[in-house]
Amino acid sequence: MTVNDATRKLVRQRANFLCEYCHSLEEASAAKFAIDHILPQSLGGSDNPDNLALACQRCNGYRYNFTTGIDPQTQEVIPLFHPRKQKWSDHFIWSTDGLRIIGVTPTGQATCNRLDVNDERHNEGSIVKARRLWLQGGWHPPEEDPRQQT
């Protein structure tokens, strides 16, 4: 089933045009962000707005139909961050330089790992390079996001 235009608009505005996983700005992207099914349709998820999140193409692709990830510290299977039920700043902070997302809870760490939000395993660090440019342009990170203290 396809998400209708009104729902797509609601999801984009509700997210303040940020990827709800990595907080990249849609306006700084070469492609419109995807409407992500938090509980994937393949696992019975619906098109209800409470099951939808705005996701950049990277996060949407890496998340695929996964709902769990591995906490790299404990090796436990942990539910991924749920944008409708959890607050981003409770699970993630930006590094002091604003280039890397740091998971501060098992959920945050498992999500960072599953979605490879800092390109530690893919793309030769291209997202960190992009964030550096966005930082220079004053577009990143979002002002309301917490940052690691020096």
Please state what every model-predicted region is.
Residues 34-40, 56:
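Histidine-centered catalytic micro-motifs used for acid/base chemistry in nuclease
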Residues 21-23:
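Right-handed parallel beta-helix
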Residues 19, 43-63:
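Short beta-strand-alpha-helix junction that forms the catalytic/metal-binding core
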Residues 1-6, 10, 25-28, 50, ...:
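Extended charged
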Residues 17-18, 28:
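Active-site-adjacent scaffolding segments
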Residues 14, 30, 47-51:
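Flanking scaffold residues of small Cys/His-coordinated metal-binding clusters
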Residues 38, 43, 72-74:
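Short edge-strand/loop segments of extracellular domains
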